[in-house]
Structure formats: structure tokens, C-alpha cells
């Protein structure tokens, strides 16, 4: 059963007005935290060959490095609800960013493979916890602007990932070391801590970021929890598979490597305005069903096009795929829409993302295996279409007006 109405409304009424300086700092803090959530991953991906050479990593160890993010997101994200209950969202965010800074700094200062892996895991732990907290922070501080703020931080996350991927190699070349290309980004993580310090140091009970949450919600015992996790997981599976293999598909269809890379970059570029608009649109519509169905339809149409005419219609398929991947920001805003309380939000966020990233880890692996077995793209794309159909069913279940606390 849902908690009494007084329990549901108290956290929101304690939140300061959007016009106050404290809430403005929280907004800046949310955007800066989001900016850092993929930088440590994409910068390492861009410099993986240089890191392998510098640390003498085997192919197997390099494979572990590339699979660590999804595993870490699932494993470390699970502790976020406990941390928030024991401490507070603001304090946990600061601790997460400190862990990210420590991991980013130490891993570029070591010559040990073991230390590099351990500190990379530390950085990913900070990212994993922050992943879980952002929907909660948006819900607490911007209950009437959830869609707009979710879209804004999704764009910030995407921009950080793209800029780091594009800039890591030039920075490394400019300083003559891959360590500079990885370590330079720790400055941004330090900056992300600053907006949270006034509230955390002051410890004001009136500030929602410093109030520990009480109570416990168990999404694993609810249908909406499982539907959310499956929806998030299948859309992330498609996203990771696309990022890992789309350029290769275009190269196999006859495009030059540079053009294939530009087409892949186009998925991200077109996706930025989609990410900004999708959460706000979700908040304005009376039902989520039209968005779930339209996004899945575009994704499936793109996959069919890639299977039948990857070269001739590449630009159209990229555009459809970019819009279809608007399921990611939609999933983030769904977390807030399917919880009544801050406790429910953080619990649903943790369950959704932990299980979802485990599902997502299968995407590149299964697509790569099917590609290696068949030597073509029809069967891998068939797998992605099946995932999109499952995503649709789960999304329609989430679209039903019910809550994780029910």
C-alpha cells in the first residue's frame, strides 16, 4: 500500500523554490555531476590502445577494461539506497565525486596493472552511485520541472561523453602521454563537488540534499520495478550494441572508415536535441504509451533498413536510430514518474539501473558473437529487433499509471 499522504508530500514541500540561490546551486551541481558520468569511460576507450601498450595489458585484460563499466554500474549502484538512507543525497554525491577524482588521478600515476584496474573500479563506483542519485535529486528539488531538468542533465551527460571521446587523444598527443589524456578530466570532477559543499557543510535540515531518507521500498517485489528494469536494460542493450558495432556495419557495407565514424557520431549528434525534448514531452502528455510505441517503431524501422539497405539509406537509418534512442532519457524520467516518494525514487532508480546494466552488457557480446558466427549482419540485427520488441512490451507495462510503493 502507498504511504499516507502526509508522508508523500513532506519531502516536496521542504524543497526550496527554484528561484532561490540554494536550488540554483543544486541545478548547477546536477548538470556538473552528469557531465562527469561518462568521461572516465569514453576517454579510456579513445586511448585504449595507448593504455594497453603503456601498461602491457593483454588482450584479455583489455577486454575486462571494456566490460567493467556495465558490471560496476550494476554492482556498485546497488549500495546507493543504503548510503542515502544512512547519510543524505548531497553527502553521497560529494563522496561519489571524490571517489571519481581519486580513481582518475591514481590510475594515471601508476605503472601497475593491478592498481590501474583497482582505481578504475573506484572511479566507476563513484559514477555508479551518482547514476542512481540523479533522478532522486531531480525529484526532490524540481518536482514540477522533472522533464526539463532530466532532459538537461541527459544532454550534459551526452556532451561530456562526446567531448571526452573526441579530445582525449589530442590532449594525450599535446602532452606526449596517454596519462594526460585520461587524468586531465579529474579537474571537472573536482568542480562538480563545489556546488554541493555549502549545503553539506552547513548541514541545514531545511535543505533537502542534507536530509537522510527513511523507510525502504522493494522494487523487486513489484511489477512496475521489473518492467522498468527490463525497459531500461533493453534500450541500453541496443545503445551499447550500436556504439560498439554500427561503424563496423557501415564499413562492411562499403563506407570508408572515416565516413563510418562520422555516421556513428551522427547518432550522438542527432540524439542531443531528442534527449532534451523527450523528458519534457513525457511530462506534458497524458499517457506514455504514444512515446513508447513511436520510439520503438523508429528503432525497429532503423534496424530493418540497416539489414536491407545499409549503404543507400544510411543517413535515414541514423536519424531514425537517434530518435529511437530517445528511450534512454524517457526511461530516466519514467523512474521519477513511477515513484511517489524520494525513498521510492532512489530504490526504483537503483533496481532499474543495476539490473538494466546487467542486461545491457549482453548487447555488444551477443551482437559480436552472432556477427563472428555468421559473417553478416542479418542475424545480429534480428537479435536487436527482438530486444526492441521486448522493450516495447516492458515500456507499455511501465506506461500504466501505477507506482513502485503500491
Regions found by a protein language model. Give the residues of each.
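Residue-level signature of mid-helix packing/kink "hotspots" within the transmembrane helices
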Residues: 42, 70-78, 162, 268-276, ...
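C-terminal transmembrane helical hairpin of 12-TM major facilitator-type secondary transporters
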Residues: 288-331
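Helix-loop-helix hairpin linking two adjacent transmembrane segments in secondary transporters
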Residues: 144-145, 152-204
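Helix-breaking motifs and short loop linkers at transmembrane-helix boundaries and internal kinks
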Residues: 56, 88, 109-114, 143, ...
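Cytoplasmic helix-loop-helix junction between adjacent transmembrane helices
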Residues: 121-155
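Extracytoplasmic gate region of multi-pass secondary transporters
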Residues: 44-45, 223-273
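Conserved MFS/SLC helix-loop-helix module at the cytosolic interface between two early adjacent transmembrane helices
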Residues: 75-114
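A late C-terminal transmembrane helix in Major Facilitator Superfamily
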Residues: 339-377, 383-384
Amino acid at each position: 500500500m502507498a504511504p499516507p499522504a502526509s508522508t508523500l508530500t513532506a519531502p516536496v514541500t521542504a524543497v526550496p523554490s527554484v528561484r532561490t540561490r540554494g536550488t540554483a546551486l543544486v541545478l548547477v551541481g546536477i548538470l556538473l555531476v552528469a557531465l562527469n558520468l561518462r568521461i572516465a569511460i569514453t576517454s579510456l576507450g579513445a586511448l585504449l590502445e595507448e593504455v594497453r601498450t603503456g601498461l602491457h595489458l593483454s588482450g584479455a585484460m583489455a577486454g575486462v577494461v571494456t566490460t567493467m563499466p556495465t558490471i560496476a554500474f550494476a554492482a556498485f549502484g546497488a549500495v546507493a539506497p543504503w548510503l542515502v538512507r544512512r547519510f543524505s543525497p548531497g553527502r553521497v554525491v560529494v563522496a561519489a565525486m571524490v571517489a571519481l577524482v581519486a580513481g582518475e588521478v591514481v590510475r594515471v600515476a601508476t605503472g601497475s596493472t593491478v592498481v590501474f584496474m583497482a582505481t578504475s573500479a573506484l572511479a566507476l563506483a563513484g559514477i555508479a552511485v551518482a547514476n542512481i542519485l540523479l533522478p532522486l535529486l531531480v525529484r526532490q528539488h524540481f518536482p514540477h520541472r522533472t522533464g526539463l531538468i532530466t532532459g538537461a542533465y541527459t544532454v550534459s551527460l551526452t556532451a561530456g561523453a562526446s567531448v571526452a571521446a573526441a579530445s582525449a587523444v589530442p590532449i594525450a598527443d599535446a602532452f606526449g602521454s596517454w596519462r594526460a589524456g585520461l587524468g586531465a578530466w579529474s579537474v571537472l570532477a573536482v568542480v562538480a563537488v563545489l556546488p554541493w559543499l555549502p549545503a553539506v557543510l552547513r548541514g541545514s535540515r531545511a535543505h533537502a540534499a542534507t536530509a537522510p531518507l527513511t523507510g525502504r521500498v522493494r522494487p523487486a517485489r513489484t511489477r512496475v520495478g521489473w518492467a522498468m528494469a527490463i525497459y531500461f536494460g533493453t534500450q541500453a542493450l541496443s545503445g551499447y550494441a550500436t556504439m560498439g558495432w554500427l561503424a563496423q556495419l557501415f564499413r562492411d557495407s562499403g563506407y570508408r572508415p572515416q565516413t563510418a565514424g562520422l555516421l556513428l557520431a551522427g547518432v550522438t549528434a542527432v540524439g542531443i536535441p531528442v534527449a532534451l525534448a523527450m523528458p519534457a514531452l513525457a511530462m506534458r502528455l497524458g499517457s506514455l504509451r504514444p512515446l513508447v510505441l513511436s520510439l520503438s517503431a523508429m528503432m525497429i524501422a532503423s534496424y530493418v533498413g540497416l539489414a536491407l539497405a545499409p549503404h543507400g539509406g544510411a543517413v535515414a537509418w541514423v536519424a531514425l536510430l537517434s530518435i529511437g534512442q530517445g528511450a534512454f532519457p524517457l526511461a530516466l524520467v519514467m523512474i521519477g514518474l513511477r515513484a511517489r516518494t524520494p525513498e521510492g525514487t532512489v530504490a526504483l532508480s537503483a533496481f532499474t539501473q543495476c539490473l538494466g546494466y546487467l542486461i545491457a552488457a549482453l548487447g555488444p557480446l551477443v551482437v559480436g558473437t552472432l556477427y563472428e558466427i555468421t559473417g553478416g549482419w542479418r542475424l545480429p540485427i534480428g537479435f536487436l529487433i527482438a530486444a526492441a520488441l521486448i522493450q516495447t512490451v516492458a515500456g507499455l507495462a511501465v506506461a500504466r499509471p501505477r507506482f513502485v510503493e503500491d
